[in-house]
């Protein structure tokens, strides 16, 4: 079993790096504002048709463009969900959503969280899934990538005030990265057996003579961007464990690759744009070390079996509860770590049924900010915050002004970095406390004791860090939970983007300093260790008390 797990992890990472390297070169061209070959004429026509100017923006203008697009998308999606019964492509005549569920869903998909307090096949029409959710899957992913584009430019430009043009970046990211790759993935899914139709639900007779209603819909097209954009919201309630979404072991492997593809490619692009590819490799090493350790822990915990069943004398050599038999324990464990390390949230197994230790690792990966590869764009700019913090700590230890890529890190940058890092822990801890203090929060818990608290903590961690997965033992479709989680998702997304853009605006105006003998190298194993230690230290100090009340207490009981 250990050899199989090692081979699975090694194969996954090897294929990932091979695919991400050329994509990273393409992203580097976009960051450097170099159009891809053959696209200049198309871009010129589109810019003219849309009335888009390619004049560069300062950080405030860039931020306002990103926020404006997302707020408009939020309003459109909210009213679309409220009135879906008036809109076409609704063969099942599904009614509009309640105001609180519509708000929660709209915020969820606009913020790239894709938390779902509903069952897709019984709640949303084809039009809502396509024109509403799928469109936001593209736009939210493009928004995250655009923000990291601006931050990378801030490190490479000197004595400037502009960071690029948000509209140009969004258009290029969507047209030349997200749409083509998602199209290829969707076609592959269709070839493997995923659904893609507009038929009404089909009544079929089972082999036992009973009648069953099979849901239909344009699944493959949404499934592709759901994974590529680290969105995670399933067309069906069972998400990627549903055979209509994820029909074969091969599609399952491709889904995991798609989740990590752009975050990995952005690390390669970062190294290429900065002129020092070792910087990108440093980030990949730090992310990969944490990732491999976490996968190993989850695999080990799930292979040990369920201790509660073992205590009863039952056969539980491995923990298969809540897992698809066609995928097994090792693949389910790998997928769980992939989807929570990134801000995806898609699942092929019920995380609520993992062992206490196996379920704690995915929760902790979300709580540290999903910086281990992370979401498209958001993972890298989240990790860059920890890089700045690590550089600052190193500067304190050696008595020098901290520098990164030749830019001095001053008080303003550190205040903004601290603010951005503290946003999500504050939301998680205060949100969980509020839920446990109120009757409306506690009434949604279906399980008592430490596991019930773990379900609450997981839900708020997932929302605040824009992941979207759940422990599922929580009746979250209520006004209290819909509003609480919507607030956490909204602030967790934009409360980090705003200080990140402010940091970019501050750094782009500075001159780059030449490296000296006293400059801390930020590309070697020493800095990789310092960066990993910073991530672990912040995560451990912040969440150990809360984790001790939930999964740790459950593990020890």
From Swiss-Prot:
The chain crosses the membrane at residues 5-25, 63-83, 132-152, 170-190, 253-273, 283-303, 329-349, 356-376, 379-399, 416-436, 484-504, 526-546. One of its GO terms (cellular component) is plasma membrane. InterPro entries: KdpA (IPR004623). GO terms for molecular function: P-type potassium transmembrane transporter activity; potassium ion binding. It is found in: Cell inner membrane. It is a multi-pass membrane protein. Keywords: Cell inner membrane, Cell membrane, Ion transport, Membrane, Potassium, Potassium transport, Transmembrane, Transmembrane helix, Transport. The keyword Transport applies. Signal peptide: none annotated. Pfam families: KdpA (PF03814). The system is composed of three essential subunits: KdpA, KdpB and KdpC. HAMAP family: KdpA. NCBIfam families: kdpA. Belongs to the KdpA family. Part of the high-affinity ATP-driven potassium transport (or Kdp) system, which catalyzes the hydrolysis of ATP coupled with the electrogenic transport of potassium into the cytoplasm. This subunit binds the periplasmic potassium ions and delivers the ions to the membrane domain of KdpB through an intramembrane tunnel. This is Potassium-transporting ATPase potassium-binding subunit. The lineage of its organism: Bacteria, Pseudomonadati, Pseudomonadota, Gammaproteobacteria, Enterobacterales.
């Amino acid at each position: 079993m250990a050899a199989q797990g090692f081979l699975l992890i090694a194969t996954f990472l090897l294929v990932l790096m091979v695919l991400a390297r050329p994509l990273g070169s393409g992203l580097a061209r976009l960051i450097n504002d170099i159009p891809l070959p053959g696209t200049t004429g198309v871009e010129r026509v589109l810019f003219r048709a849309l009335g888009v100017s390619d004049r560069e923006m300062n950080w405030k203008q860039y931020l306002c463009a990103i926020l404006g697009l997302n707020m408009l998308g939020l309003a459109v999606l909210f009213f679309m969900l409220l009135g879906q019964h008036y809109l076409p492509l609704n063969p099942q005549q599904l009614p509009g959503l309640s105001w609180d569920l519509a708000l929660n869903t709209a915020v969820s998909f606009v913020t790239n969280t894709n938390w779902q307090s509903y069952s897709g096949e019984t709640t949303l029409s084809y039009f809502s899934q396509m024109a509403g959710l799928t469109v936001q899957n593209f736009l939210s992913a493009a928004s995250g990538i655009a923000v990291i584009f601006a931050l990378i430019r801030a490190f490479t430009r000197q004595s400037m005030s502009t960071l690029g043009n948000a509209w140009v970046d969004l258009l290029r990211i969507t047209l030349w990265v997200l749409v083509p790759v998602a199209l290829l993935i969707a076609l592959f899914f269709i070839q493997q057996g995923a659904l893609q139709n507009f038929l009404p639900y089909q009544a079929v007779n089972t082999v036992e003579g009973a009648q069953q209603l099979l849901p239909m819909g344009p699944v493959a097209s949404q499934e592709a961007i759901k994974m590529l954009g680290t969105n995670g919201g399933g067309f069906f309630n069972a998400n990627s464990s549903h055979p209509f979404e994820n029909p074969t072991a091969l599609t399952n492997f491709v889904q995991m690759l798609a989740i990590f593809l752009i975050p990995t490619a952005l690390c390669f692009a970062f190294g290429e744009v900065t002129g020092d590819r070792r910087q990108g490799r440093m980030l990949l090493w730090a992310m990969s070390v944490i990732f491999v350790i976490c996968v190993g822990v989850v695999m080990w915990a799930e292979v040990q079996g369920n201790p509660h069943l073992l205590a009863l004398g039952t056969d539980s050599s491995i923990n298969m509860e809540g897992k698809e038999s066609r995928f097994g324990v090792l693949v389910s464990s790998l997928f769980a770590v992939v989807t929570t390390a990134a801000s995806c949230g898609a699942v092929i197994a019920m995380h609520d049924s993992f062992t206490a230790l196996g379920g704690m690792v995915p929760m902790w990966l979300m709580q540290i900010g999903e910086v281990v590869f992370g979401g498209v764009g958001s993972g890298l700019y989240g990790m860059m915050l920890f890089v700045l913090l690590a550089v600052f700590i190193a500067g304190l230890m050696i008595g020098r002004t901290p520098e990164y890529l030749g830019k001095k890190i001053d008080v303003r940058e550190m205040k903004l970095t601290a603010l951005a890092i503290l946003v999500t822990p504050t939301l998680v801890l205060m949100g969980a406390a509020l839920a446990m203090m109120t009757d409306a929060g506690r009434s949604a818990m279906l399980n008592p004791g430490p596991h019930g608290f773990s379900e609450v903590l997981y839900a708020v961690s997932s929302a605040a860090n824009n992941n979207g997965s759940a422990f599922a033992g929580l009746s979250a479709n209520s006004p209290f939970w819909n509003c609480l989680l919507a607030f956490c998702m909204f602030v967790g997304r934009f409360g980090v983007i705003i200080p990140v853009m402010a940091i970019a605006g501050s750094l782009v105006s500075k001159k780059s300093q030449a490296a000296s003998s006293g400059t801390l190298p930020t590309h070697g194993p020493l800095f990789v260790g310092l960066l990993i230690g910073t991530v672990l230290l912040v995560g451990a100090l912040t969440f150990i008390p809360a984790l001790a009340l939930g999964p740790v207490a459950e593990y020890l009981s």
